Amino acid sequence: MRSLTLLLSLSTALRSVAAPHPASPQGQIPLGGIPSASTSEVGIGIGIGIEEDPFPPAAGSGHNDLEDVINASPLLSFHRDLVSIESISGHEARAAAFVADFLEAHNFTVVKQPVAGDRVNIFASPRAHAHSRPEILLTSHLDTVPPFIPYSLHRNDSRPTDRQLIRIAGRGAVDAKASVAAQIFAALDILHADPSAPLGLLFVVGEEVGGDGMKAFSHDPRLNPAPSRFHTVIFGEPTDFALVAGHKGMLGFEVLASGRPAHSGYPWLGRSAVSAILPALRRVDALGHIPVHHGGLPASHKYGRTTLNIGVLEGGVATNVVPAAARADVAVRLAAGSVDDARAIIAAAVADATHRDPAVVVDFSRHLEAYPPQDLDVDVPGFEITTVNYGTDVPNLHLHPRPDGPVKRYLYGPGSIFVAHGENEGLTVGALEEAVGGYKKLVQAALERTRA
């Protein structure tokens, strides 16, 4: 219901003013600042007005005008068509076929690398380079999280033609189909100006659920030979146009407790698994705040504290039964150190908190996939620099060593991680167009570095 209200909003148009990254937890030292929303998503003003969506769904003639904006742009219409295809993890086949057909129509040689069932990765290189191998790889992912949200357009009625205020919404509109579209059109622009540019494109499946697509690429000697053909890899994820200096590592584990069932009126006849697990979980929950020399998990200047999330807690069958089993599932975002060291710290902490109770154990067997913090390159000028706490396919791409030194790895993309995976996922027309320039800048820097 509409209501009169005092509207307060803060402009984020002052992008040049550095501010702590909104993803930074207490104690994390940001390497640079990016705002939590783009200038197209938050306006400035104070006054009495009608409270309503600043980006209402387009309707009537205005809707037709917005469709004309999209139809007039190959980039925007490609992005629209890709976002309109449902590609929840495990069901990426239609999206992969669409991207493959588009690239083949634009003079790319396309390899459809099998992953599982009808799921394929798309690896492409310019058809004119049939006898050479790409050296600069742009990569992102085709899958999205559920649920599917259809593509839609929204406008700000006060400035309906401002490309920074025309908002594109839908599942994957940001994560990561905006990166896919911007990378493809950056490559097309570069190849038009420099047909010899040794570019490759890789769009994988399964990034959101363990990275099986990128792992399949890594293990394919045809596409990923030794030594590595690539001297530069540019990963596409929502970074709000910042270059990411790295992201935290990740591991997971379960805490399992066993007890003995009994009638809850006579609890001394049994043993509560829930009561047994609680001291362990209290300690686990605090490990990111405990100094290492007191048995806690490490922190770093770059990434801040290690954080833990007890995401699942299960136990018991009824309130009148002493619970015979309890289980907790925990995710760790690791700020420093190795996975093995972190696992040892966690196991020791649980043992200490439970006085080495054999009925309470730590189990890492269901979370074998783990990785330490991932440091990335940020040596291209003209970008803000930050760190992020989310995971990516960076640790899933295993490249063979090159004789001339390590492979450069960059992480960049349009859109905010704070709307990715949410019901309001979206970005503006202007943001998507700006990202093409960002990817071109990264590619040009790689070309200049190697040709020099």
From Swiss-Prot:
PANTHER family per the UniProt record, alphabetical: ACETYLORNITHINE DEACETYLASE, PEPTIDASE M20 DIMERISATION DOMAIN-CONTAINING PROTEIN
Residues annotated as binding Zn(2+) 2: D175
Organism field: Aspergillus clavatus (strain ATCC 1007 / CBS 513.65 / DSM 816 / NCTC 3887 / NRRL 1 / QM 1276 / 107)
UniProt name for this protein: Probable carboxypeptidase ACLA_088580
Keyword terms, alphabetized: Glycoprotein, Hydrolase, Metal-binding, Protease, Secreted, Signal, Zinc
Major localisation: secreted
GO molecular function, one term: peptidase activity
Annotated binding of Zn(2+) 1, by residue: D175, E208
